[in-house]
UniProtKB/Swiss-Prot annotation:
It is found in: Nucleus. Residues 198-212 have a biased composition (Acidic residues). This is DNA mismatch repair protein MSH3. Residues 82-91 have a biased composition (Low complexity). GO terms for biological process: mismatch repair; mitotic recombination. One of its GO terms (molecular function) is mismatched DNA binding. SUPFAM superfamilies: DNA repair protein MutS, domain I (SSF55271), DNA repair protein MutS, domain III (SSF48334), P-loop containing nucleoside triphosphate hydrolases (SSF52540). It comes from Chaetomium globosum (strain ATCC 6205 / CBS 148.51 / DSM 1962 / NBRC 6347 / NRRL 1970). Residues 132-144 have a biased composition (Basic and acidic residues).
Length: 1156
């Protein structure tokens, strides 16, 4: 039972008390006479039956427990026991602590007593069963005589109290989630709310406890945050500064998640989340929800969280147990600090990276972190043309791409760059226009987007003076890196200062952003700054990448079935990344292109030679991702086993080519191969110098203590090792002292049990000899194990030396990484050379396939030309079981500049034009092509308008997408571009679509004069070809029609329609001159298993419409013939002008007759 309190205690009322008419006052606590005047007045109003039963005066009733019991049963209302000291305590306090419904019999309702009762004996407590039954009885007579139940002095105070209790009741149990909240408290083992027992609470404690604490660092008295552990408070301090980060906190031998982070981790990692509060201001729960993972699985789980799109922070303990015990803060929690932050674009801490091919259908993104900023172009609307600056960084390789350009309202330019770069994370500086913002959300927001995975988007504000601030920030960043007359540093700063303003803004934002991750030093490598729009490469926009399936197929967005999949025979990861760049950026520099093709040719000719086999063997032996390992060394994030593997791999490569002293020693003639091989032996000296410092066995086992050879250890490492040796020697000497105390003649022997070292075993029969100062650690039935005070002291000293040694070893390893990072440039050049050799060998392997030939590049002065003999689709021939039917075609200026391609549905028109475009692309990346022969001039861009799709995110219909892409082509195409237009105009009515197709074909043939492949089902466009002076050539995809012929059935009857429906088409997939006047759509409908009745109706309607068109053409031809005859007869004696006027109608007549 709790002792009496020194102050009046404010207690939580029972839930049942809220339903009584009034709570009785304490009759005898406020006056020496046993009750207040108000109470005596109330007693005088008792009914007559009560007075008869009592049979005595009021004073006697108060002192008789039996009479009191009878009184309570008849009064039918609560009655409080007398309590002379007013402390509000009774003998039933223990029972109240176990029940929420039970209540203290002496609960204080009115104001505290002014004077304690003296000389009155406390009344014994009635039996609890009758008390619970009778104390809440309802007395209607009492209400009739005194509706308030209180005197005037107590009325206001009691009303306030009851209103406060009612408010608490409604707050706790008056909402739909109240029962669920109680169940969760039961689940947490909190069957009783703190504060219901009323013990030790201060005035106003209840009200504060029920209120939700504000998320501030100051803790209210009685608030739940006051019950957090010191470690949880430490977690909150870090979380407040990183609210957007999932924190993984090191706690002993585990890493733990707390609060909302635990729920996220449980969902993404499929681990258990222990229930608790998910927010630090959540009421009624005094501990956080949590989840945990083992220390050795940290990298695996962090990688999974990052891949899911989360920003993850790792909070580590910066103190060890031994050093903390020896320090001044031994009673404080471990010091913890946020040491690492990871996102998709900055995660490079493990050898298994995020951009490796995944298990899903979609290929992964390119590993770039892309920053973009936008500003409106002066004089235009806010959503029209905009000026955009972009900078993309690949932290794992050190590559940096930047660009500055103006974009139209369709945002084709920024879309092209996003599709080329495929960023896994975007940093948006400032506000974006509505159109740009929708594009970014569309490309990055879906888990099945064109990037292959959901991309993370982060936004930072942009001030009005951002340009000036960015310039100053970038200048200061690089100014500290310029050292005296260092020419390299000076050129670095000069190159950065020449960047466009919008790119400088992006660079400043990226420096600030990557500083948080410790990766800002990547911008020191300005050698790898590349402009996206340098005219050394062919322009391939985003639409073309998708239409030609360059990186991903159009079916499931996976890499299989793409051009990259068909060409990728690389052996190393740096080689694969370089090949991807080559495919996306074909060359325009003829000299570089010839150099690359010549290298592929030489490797192909000597593919069975020892030299080529050795190159392949060296590349096959490279298992590590050297490019990423080097950048991890540069960042200081490399592990010891990885460092050993990287250095040994580089040494093995240098030894393999150690005999190469001059370019002639390489054994190749191609300058590209010679330069690549000649760069490899030079790294041998650098790598060997660092390997000589390392103990290979220790590095392989990740043993930091013996990682360095003895003569390469630092002074700190040596001192701490000597200190450990000295302590261990003292422990050995101490064995004799221990034996002396145990009355033994021979020194005791230390044993290790369950990881506890230096235990002294003593048989239980000899325990009488053990000094009292020895600490028993463990034991069995026969013996006990002890630590002496000296052993404990020496072990603590040894542990301190060990932990200091570990820190010294880590510092020495960090210094070694910094030293290797100073040699990053030559090592990176060597890895780049290996990647080049890998790509060339891959292209040579492709060239060795049957039917591949070397393309011939025509002189620059030659008019635009593409000539292909027996060409094949480079992707389809690998996927089709029966192979691909070759085609022969040519485009040339002045004629034929364009081809008008017709043919039946599914006849191979789209496959043919894609094959031509892909062969041009292959030729200009330096690859052999699947054709008997191919000659071409360099093409500066490939534009495509293929397929039918809408653009909901931009509010564009299918036809709007068609004409918008066509407009962009007409604006950007030059005389040296290749344009592919597939069924332009099909998104609108026949007349409008044919008119647009007519106009566009005429424009590209007469105005732009670019090489064009134009697919259409509008056969009347053949007239345009005839009227363009041979610039357009009509071709069609050959086919054979079999089955009942139309002339076998009577015209217009059902048999004729059935003949159309039954007619079968055999596709020959060959290109031939001429126009196909029918598309045979019913044949495709039949292959798609359209119901027979529907096909019959469609055939009949098709025949009716076709005959109607023929009839109109025939009538028109007759009228035209009459006009020609009439004009010829009337104008026989006229001048030459009449003859000229008659030429056009005559030609029109001939064309009409041909179409009949």
């Amino acid at each position: 039972m709790a002792g009496p309190s020194r102050a009046p205690v404010k207690k939580q009322a029972s839930l049942t008390s809220f339903f009584t008419a009034n709570i009785s006052s304490k009759k005898h606590a406020n006056s020496p006479g046993g009750g207040s005047a108000a109470n005596r007045n109330k007693d005088e109003t008792e009914d007559e039956n009560t007075q008869k039963i009592i049979g005595k005066g009021k004073e006697k009733d108060e002192s008789s427990p039996i009479t009191l019991s009878v009184l309570e049963s008849n009064r039918k209302r609560p009655l409080q026991d007398n309590n002379s000291n007013g402390n509000g305590r009774s003998s039933r306090a223990a029972k109240r602590a176990k029940s929420v419904v039970s209540e203290d019999d002496s609960e204080e309702v009115s104001s505290p007593p002014v004077q304690a009762s003296t000389g009155r004996t406390p009344i014994p407590e009635p039996p609890s069963s009758s008390s619970r039954t009778e104390r809440y009885a309802y007395d209607a007579d009492r209400l009739a005589s005194d509706p308030s139940g209180l005197n005037e002095d107590e009325d206001a105070a009691t009303r306030r109290k009851k209103e406060e209790l009612h408010r608490k009741f409604v707050k706790k149990l008056g909402h739909p989630d109240s029962l669920a909240s109680l169940r969760r408290r039961e689940l947490l083992g909190q069957n009783e709310s703190p504060g219901l027992d009323g013990e030790g609470e201060e005035e106003g404690g209840d009200a504060e406890e029920d209120e939700t604490p504000l998320p501030s660092k100051t803790k209210k008295k009685g608030a739940k945050t006051g019950k957090l552990t010191p470690m949880e408070i430490q977690f909150l301090d870090i979380k407040r500064k990183h609210m957007d980060t999932v924190l993984v906190v090191e706690v002993g031998y585990k890493f733990r998640f707390f609060g909302e982070d635990a729920r996220i981790a449980a969902k993404e990692l499929s681990i258990v989340c222990i229930p608790g509060k998910f927010r630090y201001d959540e009421p009624h729960i005094d501990r956080f929800a949590s989840a945990s993972i083992p220390v050795h699985r940290l990298s695996v789980h962090v990688k999974r969280l990052v891949a899911a799109g989360h920003k993850v922070g790792v909070v580590r303990q910066l103190e060890t147990a031994a050093l903390k015990k020896a320090g001044d803060n031994r009673n404080a929690p471990f010091v913890r600090k946020l040491t690492n932050i990871y996102t998709k674009g900055t995660y490079i801490d493990e050898t298994g990276e995020l951009d490796q091919p995944g298990e899903g259908a979609g290929a992964s993104a390119g590993g770039y972190l892309l920053c973009l900023t936008e500003s409106p172009v002066k004089g235009l609307g806010t959503d029209e043309n905009v000026h955009i600056g972009v900078m993309a960084v690949q932290p794992a390789t050190g590559d940096i791409i930047y660009d500055d350009f103006e974009d139209g309202f369709m945002r084709r330019e920024i879309e092209t760059r996003l599709l080329h770069i495929s960023p896994c994370e975007l940093l948006v500086v400032g506000e974006l226009s509505k159109a740009t913002n929708k594009l970014v959300q569309h490309l990055a927001g879906s888990s099945t987007n064109v990037f292959g995975d959901r991309s993370r988007v982060e936004r930072v504000p942009k001030s009005k003076t951002m340009a000036a601030e960015a310039s100053s920030h970038v200048t200061q960043f690089y100014a500290g890196k310029v050292k005296g007359d260092d020419e390299r540093s000076a050129s670095l700063l000069d190159k950065v200062l020449k960047l466009p303003e919008s790119v400088t803004v992006c660079l400043s934002a990226m420096i600030t952003h990557l500083t948080e991750y410790g990766l800002e030093h990547i911008f020191d490598l300005t050698k790898y700054f590349q402009s996206f729009t340098t005219r050394q490469h062919m322009l391939i926009n985003g639409t073309t990448l998708e239409s030609l399936e360059v990186y991903r197929n159009a079916t499931d967005q996976s890499e299989k079935g793409s051009l990259l999949w068909a060409l990728d025979k690389t052996r190393t990861r740096p080689g694969r990344r370089l090949l991807r760049k080559w495919i996306g950026r074909p060359l325009l520099d003829r000299e570089r292109l010839e150099e690359r093709v010549t290298a592929v040719e030489e490797l192909l000719e000597h593919q069975s030679n020892f030299k080529v086999d050795r190159l392949g063997g060296v590349l096959n032996s490279i298992k590590a991702d050297l490019e990423r390992s080097l950048i991890r060394i540069y960042y200081g994030k490399c592990t010891r086993p990885e460092l050993l593997s990287t250095l040994q791999t580089l040494q093995r490569i240098s030894i393999e080519f150690s005999r190469v002293k001059t370019p002639e020693d390489t054994g190749f003639n191609s300058s590209l191969i010679v330069e690549a091989i000649y760069a490899l032996p030079g790294i041998g000296t650098i790598v060997s110098a660092y390997l000589d410092k390392i103990n290979p066995e220790a590095a392989r086992k990740d043993d930091k203590y013996t990682f360095f050879r003895d003569d390469e250890e630092t002074e700190d490492i040596t001192n701490h090792k000597l200190g450990i040796a000295a302590v261990e020697a003292d422990l050995d000497v101490h064995r004799k002292d221990a034996a002396t105390k145990l009355s033994k003649k021979t020194p005791v022997t230390y044993v290790t049990v369950s990881g506890i070292e230096y235990l002294i075993e003593v048989p239980n029969t000899d325990l009488k000899h053990v000094p009292a100062s020895w600490a028993k650690i463990s034991g069995t039935k026969k013996l006990s194990r002890f630590h002496t005070p000296e052993v404990m002291r020496l072990m603590n000293e040894r542990d301190q030396h060990k932990e200091a040694l570990a820190a010294a070893c880590d510092n020495a390893f960090t210094d070694l990484l910094k030293s290797i990072a100073s040699e990053y440039q030559p090592l990176r050049d060597a890895v780049a050379s290996l990647a080049t050799l890998d790509c060339l060998l891959s292209l040579a392997q492709v060239a060795s396939l049957p039917g591949y030939s070397k393309p011939t590049f025509l002189p620059t002065a030659t008019p635009p030309t593409i000539s292909i003999t027996s060409g094949r689709h480079p992707i389809a021939e690998h996927t089709l079981p029966d192979g691909y039917i070759p085609f022969t075609t040519s485009l040339a200026s002045p004629s034929p500049l364009a081809q008008l391609i017709t043919g039946p549905n599914m006849g191979g028109k789209s496959s043919y034009v894609r094959a031509v475009a892909l062969l041009v692309l292959l030729a200009q990346i330096g690859s052999y092509v699947p054709a008997e022969a191919m000659s071409l001039t360099l093409t500066d861009a490939i534009y495509t308008r293929m397929g039918a799709r809408d653009n909901l995110f931009a509010g564009e219909s299918t036809f709007m997408v068609e004409v918008s892409e066509t407009a962009a082509i007409l604006r950007g195409a030059t005389a040296r571009s290749l344009v592919v237009l597939d069924e332009l105009g099909r998104g609108t009515s026949t007349h409008d679509g044919a008119a647009i197709a007519h106009a566009v074909l005429a424009h590209v043939a007469r105005e732009t004069r670019c090489l064009t492949l134009f697919i259409t089902h509008y056969q009347n466009l053949a007239r345009v070809a005839d009227g363009l002076g041979g610039a357009v050539r009509c071709v069609h995809m050959r086919f054979e029609a079999t089955g009942r012929q139309r002339d076998e059935a009577a015209d217009g009857d059902a048999d004729a329609a059935a003949a159309d429906a039954d007619e079968e088409i055999t596709f020959l997939y060959e290109v031939a001159d001429g126009v196909a006047h029918r598309s045979y759509g019913l044949n495709v409908a039949r292959l798609a298993r359209i119901p027979r009745r529907v096909l019959d109706v469609a055939a009949r309607k098709s025949r009716e419409m076709e005959e109607g068109v023929k009839a109109r053409r025939l009538r028109g031809a007759v009228r035209l013939l009459e006009d020609v005859v009439a004009g010829g007869g009337g104008g026989g004696g006229g001048g030459g002008g009449d003859g000229d006027d008659g030429e056009d109608p005559l030609e029109h007549l001939v064309s009409s007759i041909e179409q009949l």
